[in-house]
Curated annotation (Swiss-Prot):
Natural source organism: Bacillus subtilis (strain 168)
Single GO biological process annotation from the record: DNA-templated transcription initiation
Matching HAMAP family: RNApol_bact_RpoZ
Entry keyword annotation includes Transferase: yes
Described function: Promotes RNA polymerase assembly. Latches the N- and C-terminal regions of the beta' subunit thereby facilitating its interaction with the beta and alpha subunits. In vitro reconstitution experiments this subunit is dispensible.
Family as reported in the entry's similarity comment: Belongs to the RNA polymerase subunit omega family.
Ranges annotated as spanning the membrane: none
Keywords, ordered alphabetically: DNA-directed RNA polymerase, Nucleotidyltransferase, Transcription, Transferase
UniProt xrefs under SMART domains: RNA_pol_Rpb6
Protein name per the record: DNA-directed RNA polymerase subunit omega
A family per Pfam: RNA_pol_Rpb6
EC number(s) recorded for this UniProt protein: 2.7.7.6
Subunit text: RNAP is composed of a core of 2 alpha, a beta and a beta' subunit. The core is associated with a delta subunit, and at least one of epsilon or omega. When a sigma factor is associated with the core the holoenzyme is formed, which can initiate transcription.
GO cellular component, one term: cytosolic DNA-directed RNA polymerase complex
Length: 67
């Protein structure tokens, strides 16, 4: 079973596509800057760590209005 679960992650963001985009961008940022918001993570991989940050409510996403 995956932790965090997809159900708990979907409560934080509006779609699976947004979830993938936000977690991939954050994972790339962690690789470059070597920083993470959670001290002790379950996952050893960057994407897993990013998903844990999203589940903890440490990352958010705002849609930009394009007019």
């Amino acid at each position: 079973m995956l932790d965090p679960s997809i159900d708990s992650l979907m409560n934080k963001l509006d779609s699976k596509y947004t979830l993938v985009t936000v977690s991939a961008r954050r994972a790339r940022e962690m690789q470059i800057k070597k920083d993470q918001m959670i001290e002790h993570t379950i996952s050893h991989k960057y994407v897993g760590k990013a998903l844990e940050e999203i589940d903890a409510g440490l990352l958010s996403f705002e849609k930009e209005d394009r007019e």
